[in-house]
Amino acid sequence: MTRSRSRSARSRSGGAAPDTLLLLEHPPVVTLGRSARPEHLLAPPAALAARGIELHRVARGGDVTYHGPGQLVGYAIVDLAARGRPDVTAFLRRIEAVLCAALAELGVAAYTRPGWTGVFASPASAGPPRKIASIGIGLRGWVTWHGFALNVSLDPAAFDVIVPCGLREVAMTSVERELGHARPPALELRARELVARHFERDFALAPS
């Protein structure tokens, strides 16, 4: 998948392809972003391997995160130069807004927190903030080639092997957990359709 994204980014940079949104699901894997700290990996590589979890260092921004079945991962391949070279932080904020809109249609109220990247489930409770989506962007030239991970039906316990995004004060959650007994049928398909629709509407991205 990394090679596929890299090819897509090169094609977009060369003008041979349009802006694209890749939507997919990864097998169990822990990825280390450019800001990842060793102490945020709570299990040694051998222990991860014994549980069938791969470990990779990647070129996106951010710290450490987990990907696995039940999580919708989106890679936005976007030529920011063709869009007037907007601030990358502004691009991140737009992704957060798109995810909040899609989550609202799924029945999950969501919000963003000043100074933090990602999307959180609301209302805020007496416990720790509940993070439902993580975002990490990588750039090649002015082309983005990383994106977001939305926990749809993924068991949040999967994150126990890391300090997610380096935030010890955060608890991970999922759409399924937030909905409880209100979980609709075909939740994963519905989430994918809504995210694709909102990205297409807000970014004019063609899902792939």
What is the predicted function of each stretch?
Residues M1-P129, H181, P185-L189:
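N-terminal lobe of the biotin/lipoate ligase/transferase fold
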Residues L99, G127-R130, G147, A171, ...:
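A broad "ordered helical/assembly scaffold" signature
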